[in-house]
Amino acid sequence: MNQVLITTRIDQFLGQPTAKTFAQLQRNLHASRSENTSAEELGELNRMLGLGDYSGVLSKSDELFDRWCLSPRFHYLRGQAALQLGDEQAAAEARALSQECLYWLCESGDGTFESPYRVTYRSDETDILMAFNLRKRNQMLVAGPNGRLDVVTMHDGVEIWFDVENAL
């Protein structure tokens, strides 16, 4: 995938966050999956944050921004690092981006089998569940009419469905 196109889509989404610009950027990120976006990268940022390497988190997240730009958790980690360094403006911007990404993820579906949430990254599932204060009992990958779906069952029996066919 052309990096210039991804950067253009990021700029379009940040300039005008809409369902359309979110979906376009999401499709472009999915198409560029060969660039090795790995959950280990988020894990590394989380580990660095836990060790108090706040400058390292910000530096590393600058490198990873183009790959993780639609991840609520990525922006949350950036915001926490900025907050620990006393940069209130950067922390507020990261919180706003985290909330914006979460909002558009939740707008991508309603969590039913017929209209699952279309996640960009596998970590988006946990972010959505946490936003609704839901605790999962179990999780299962199933074949859906348009690809792979993750069904997460809550402790009260409610099922939340996620389209993970292209999840990074």
Label the model's feature ranges:
Residues 68-70, 102-103:
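Short coil turns that delineate tetratricopeptide repeat
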Residues 83-106:
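TPR/TPR-like (Sel1-like) alpha-helical repeat modules
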Residues 41, 75-78:
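TPR repeat positional signature
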Residues 38, 72-73:
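Helix-start (N-cap) detector for alpha-helical repeat units in TPR-like alpha-solenoids
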